[in-house]
C-alpha cells in the first residue's frame, strides 16, 4: 500500500499553505502551481513510485529503480490547478518491488523535499 510522505519541517511558507500536521499543501490563492516532490530512499534494490495526489486521487507519478549502493532520490513534478479554497495535494510513496526501503539513509545529503510554487492565476 502507499504511504504518505511526512514532510514535517518547513524552511519557507510565505502564505501558510502547507500544513505540517496533515502533510497537505492547500493554496489560498486560485491558480496554477508547479508541484515538486523529491523523495530520498535508502540503499536497497528495487522499484519505488512517488505519487502526487490531488484531493485524494493520484495525479502524477514517477517510478524509480534503486540500486543496492547509497540512497537515491525519486522526483515527480506536475503543474496543478487549485481553486484557492479546498483543493490540496499530498505526496505518497509506494514500493513496487525489492526489499523494504526507508526514507533517507541517515546522512545530511539524503533530504526529501516538497515545494509548491505559484505560476499564474486561473
What does each of the following model-derived ranges do?
Residues 1, 20, 56, 77, ...:
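Intrinsically disordered, low-complexity segments enriched in Ser/Pro/Gly/Ala and basic residues
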Residues 1-46, 62, 69-70, 99-122:
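Terminal (often C-terminal
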Residues 36-40, 51-53, 79, 92-94, ...:
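Residue-level recognition of well-ordered beta-strand positions that form the cores
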Residues 45-58:
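Short, surface-exposed beta-strand/strand-loop-strand elements in extracellular ectodomains
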Residues 71-96:
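Short, surface-exposed tryptophan/glycine-enriched loops
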Amino acid at each position: 500500500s502507499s504511504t504518505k510522505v511526512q514532510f514535517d519541517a518547513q524552511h519557507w511558507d510565505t502564505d501558510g499553505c502547507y500544513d505540517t500536521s496533515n502533510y497537505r499543501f492547500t493554496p489560498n490563492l486560485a491558480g496554477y502551481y508547479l508541484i515538486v516532490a523529491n523523495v530520498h530512499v535508502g540503499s536497497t534494490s528495487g522499484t519505488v513510485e512517488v505519487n502526487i495526489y490531488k484531493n485524494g486521487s493520484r495525479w502524477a507519478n514517477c517510478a524509480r529503480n534503486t540500486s543496492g549502493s547509497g540512497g537515491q532520490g525519486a522526483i515527480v513534478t506536475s503543474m496543478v490547478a487549485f481553486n484557492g479554497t479546498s483543493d490540496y495535494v499530498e505526496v505518497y510513496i509506494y514500493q513496487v518491488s525489492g526489499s523494504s526501503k526507508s526514507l533517507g539513509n541517515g546522512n545530511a545529503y539524503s533530504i526529501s523535499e516538497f515545494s509548491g510554487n505559484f505560476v499564474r492565476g486561473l
